[in-house]
Swiss-Prot record:
Record NCBIfam families: PRK10445.1
Summary of the function given for this chain in its UniProt record: Involved in base excision repair of DNA damaged by oxidation or by mutagenic agents. Acts as a DNA glycosylase that recognizes and removes damaged bases. Has a preference for oxidized pyrimidines, such as thymine glycol, 5,6-dihydrouracil and 5,6-dihydrothymine. Has AP (apurinic/apyrimidinic) lyase activity and introduces nicks in the DNA strand. Cleaves the DNA backbone by beta-delta elimination to generate a single-strand break at the site of the removed base with both 3'- and 5'-phosphates.
Source organism (scientific name): Salmonella schwarzengrund (strain CVM19633)
GO biological process: base-excision repair
Gene3D superfamilies according to UniProt: 1.10.8.50, MutM-like, N-terminal (3.20.190.10)
Zn-finger (FPG-type) residues: 229-263
Alphabetized InterPro entries for the sequence: DNA_glyclase/AP_lyase_DNA-bd, DNA_glyclase_Znf_dom_DNA_BS, EcNei-like_N, Endonuclease-VIII, FPG_cat, MutM-like_N-ter, Ribosomal_uS13-like_H2TH, Znf_DNA_glyclase/AP_lyase
Membrane-spanning intervals of the chain: none
Pfam families cross-referenced by the UniProt entry: Fapy_DNA_glyco, H2TH, zf-FPG_IleRS
Cofactor annotation: Zn(2+)
Source organism superkingdom: Bacteria
Protein name, as recorded: Endonuclease 8
SMART domains for this protein: Fapy_DNA_glyco, H2TH
Entry's family note: Belongs to the FPG family.
Amino acid sequence: MPEGPEIRRAADNLEAAIKGKPLTDVWFAFAQLKPYESQLTGQIVTRIETRGKALLTHFSNGLTLYSHNQLYGVWRVIDTGEIPQTTRILRVRLQTADKTILLYSASDIEMLTADQLTTHPFLQRVGPDVLDARLTPEEVKARLLSPRFRNRQFSGLLLDQAFLAGLGNYLRVEILWQVGLTGQHKAKDLNEAQLNALSHALLDIPRLSYTTRGQADENKHHGALFRFKVFHRDGEACERCGGIIEKTTLSSRPFYWCPHCQK
C-alpha cells in the first residue's frame, strides 16, 4: 500500500492538472453524491490536501471531497476527451477544459462541509501528517511521550495512523534503522538522545523520500538521495556495520533490520 510520500506526490500530480481551473463537468458514480455534480460544475479546486492515506479535494464553494483509496483505489490524470483503456470501475470524474482527473475502484468517498470536516470519524482519529511542514520534532517528541503512546512498542506504533499519519511499513523499518533501534522498544524507555534522534527521523525520512521523488519498488531506491538501507535487503550487508540484514515479522508486517547495530 502506498505510504505518505507516494500519496502526497499523487496529490501533487492531481493539483498540477486541475488546480485553479473551472470545472466544466463533474460526475459521481454513487447516488448520494449525484446532487453535488451541478453544485461543483463551474467551481474551482483550490487545493488537494493529504491526511495520511486520505485525500481532501477542496472546492471554491467550501465543499470538500473526502476519498480514501484503501487497497484498490487509484487516481489518474488524462487529457480531457481521452477515453482510458481500463477494466477498473470509475467512481469520480472532475473535468476541466484541458485536463481531467479520475478516481477508480475506491468506495470510501464522501462530500463534506467545513463543519463536517471537523467531525469526520477518520479525520478525527488520524494524527498529524509527517509531511505537514508545520509539524516539528518537538511536537513529535511530545506525542511519543504522551500517555496515549509512550507505552506502545514501535513495531506497532509506527504503523498506527493515529500516532502520525503517512507512516507505513517501509518508513517504519528505515526510521528504526536510522536511529539504531529495534521494534520492541517503547518511548518511555529511551534516553534523551534517543528520543531526539527518533523525533527527527520520524519527520526527516518521510520528507526526504517525498522530496527526492522516490517510490517503493523492487529497485530499493528513492530517487538520487533516498536509498533503502534495510527494506527488501535481507541477506545483504548493512552499510553501517557490515552485519547481515535479516527479515522477520512484526505487527503482522515484514520487518527488516540489522541485528548487529540495531539494539
